[in-house]
Amino acid sequence: MICRWIAFNSSKVSRSLSPFSSLLFTKSSFSVAKMDDESLPTTNSTSDHRGFYKEILFGMKKIGFREFLHGYHFRGLVSELRHVHVEEIMDELMSESSDLSVWFFKELRDIYAFRHSSFSTLLVSHVLAGQRRFKELQVILEQLLQEEGTLCELLSNSFRKWESTGLVWDMLLFLSSRLRMVDDSLYILKKMKDQNLNVSTQSYNSVLYHFRETDKMWDVYKEIKDKNEHTYSTVVDGLCRQQKLEDAVLFLRTSEWKDIGPSVVSFNSIMSGYCKLGFVDMAKSFFCTVLKCGLVPSVYSHNILINGLCLVGSIAEALELASDMNKHGVEPDSVTYNILAKGFHLLGMISGAWEVIRDMLDKGLSPDVITYTILLCGQCQLGNIDMGLVLLKDMLSRGFELNSIIPCSVMLSGLCKTGRIDEALSLFNQMKADGLSPDLVAYSIVIHGLCKLGKFDMALWLYDEMCDKRILPNSRTHGALLLGLCQKGMLLEARSLLDSLISSGETLDIVLYNIVIDGYAKSGCIEEALELFKVVIETGITPSVATFNSLIYGYCKTQNIAEARKILDVIKLYGLAPSVVSYTTLMDAYANCGNTKSIDELRREMKAEGIPPTNVTYSVIFKGLCRGWKHENCNHVLRERIFEKCKQGLRDMESEGIPPDQITYNTIIQYLCRVKHLSGAFVFLEIMKSRNLDASSATYNILIDSLCVYGYIRKADSFIYSLQEQNVSLSKFAYTTLIKAHCVKGDPEMAVKLFHQLLHRGFNVSIRDYSAVINRLCRRHLVNESKFFFCLMLSQGISPDLDICEVMIKSDELLSWTIKWGLLPD
């Protein structure tokens, strides 16, 4: 059989189709139903295969090729059809016409989903190659490669003498490299060399492309005889991907290019390489070189440079380049606008991103999933979750389906971070209903959000669901569960989960241990933290600085500062360096007990180790500085000394390039107020404003409370009035503090005035606020004023409680009045 196929293919004598081959188009009037009544030779399951395929051939001769294959009789035979039968039939058909054999192959495959043997597939492949039907050849061989592999031995042994075998080998090489079948492509290349078969430049380029990021690229390159533009461009791209940009430029100038000349594609690779490394100016110079060489930069060329400019923050230059694209005969595409929108997003300029998208729509371009993802990221980053949901709804209304996990994950993250877990779960379920399977990232986001809110039952249910779907949870997923349990104080449950992960044999990183150790430390369970630390060491896992920082915090929380100090030395024994958190945590413990000497020692040690302090570090230093002085023994000289040290501390911060923030100033102001240096506190308030830092309500609360505590009520009134003139929003605490101070000082008129302001500004006034005022007025025997506030409370729909009634009853002058109103308690 094989010999006859080889003889047919090797013969150069053209054959005319025999009458048998015309059966494909003849006897069209023959009734298929009538065929069932004809006497056809039949076979049973015990018949030999030769009789079986003869029955099929007889049927095709009797009624016509097409009619028989589509008839009911053949449909009944298909289930018994085997590879050997098909090969015998194709043998007969090949002797008449190769077209018939190919057609029979396709009919069985397409109509009856018959899975052909590798031999039949290679046979048809050789026929198609001989007829230069390369697209069909590619489809057939690609499927064969994916299902069976290269089958080099079968190809070598059975089809060596076919004239078209070189084309089949070449196509196999091309497809195997394109399908990233590395070992197969190299083996095919070796077999082709052994048989002296010609390898096309296209196939060589495909192999070269696959190895472009390795040194193997040069071995393939040297074997290519007829190099073309694609060959050179692939080498340049490979060198750029290997970050060998100087070699790429040198190769670009090589003499091998003299006949072809460099292409825009090669310049694009070099520009992209420089942009990825942040050397945008170099990329711009090559863009100019493209123009000097008489080449026309493509849209992709512009997009590379625009993206590079956006990544380094040169958004204005990127916009200018985009507007000049039409000068080079190209127009910005949706990718261009997406890059610009992302550039604005990276700078936090979401309004600019919206302007770019509006321009995009004006140009008649439609936003894609990437566009929406960029806008969603921007809105969620700014906390505009509702706007993000509007964008998602608009995306769906434009016909986009939830077929991309990225925008959904962005939205899920935004919802979970703002505590809107019910909406996150709704979106999560909608994704599944629309056929979009959540991935590991999506599951981890929702599980983390549920754990933050303490909804562990739902979190564990989702955890089990993802495991059932064979989505393996990673450290982030486990970390979310452990962190949530620790934050809720469920340390036993957290330890149980960690132990189950350890016993499962799964490789755990130090992060998971750190979460539980930190949970123990923050709860003051230092012994349990140390016990788990021993487990870490015994397991052979290297602890991190975060591990030791948690232990330092735990010791400090339990007032064992001496042991916490020793941890700094232990860190170094493990080849690690203490971090700024290590020192700041220990400094805070010393600050709480006013040990400024130890704080100074740690500060000097930080400088010696080259560890720069942070705003938090300096806030702790200021706290220690102020607490180091006994408040009751603080005379004017000591206050001035503290004041000057605070000013020097600010100068030190600025000299180290650390701009003081609100917390720093609030810390200084608070402790200056505690030592009764109010003038100094107001000086720092002015310094704060001069640094363009807006004082928070906490800052004003500290100052107003201090003025009232130390009896400077009029100054407090003036201060609040000046703040109101500046349209500064004050907190409820500021008003109630001053109201209570006026009541104590016996100035009910000002208290009434401020209370009206409190109500006018829409604050939620409770019975506790009325009780505080009435209580103080009654103690001062201010009957009418107490009565006024009592009536005001009733007018606001607030009923008095037992405490208020008792206070008013104790005032003799109010007793009869309370009885009159029927408010005497039982």
UniProtKB/Swiss-Prot annotation:
Coiled-coil residue windows: none
Keyword terms of this UniProt record: Repeat
PROSITE patterns membership: PPR
Pfam families the UniProt entry points to: PPR, PPR_2
Protein name: Putative pentatricopeptide repeat-containing protein At1g13630
Record-stated family: Belongs to the PPR family. P subfamily.
Alphabetized InterPro entries for the sequence: Pentatricopeptide_rpt, PPR-containing_protein, TPR-like_helical_dom_sf
Keyword Repeat among record annotations: yes
Signal peptide range in chain numbering: none
Chain positions of PPR repeats: 228-262, 263-297, 298-332, 333-367, 368-402, 404-438, 439-473, 474-508, 509-543, 544-578, 579-613, 614-648, 661-695, 696-730, 731-765, 766-800
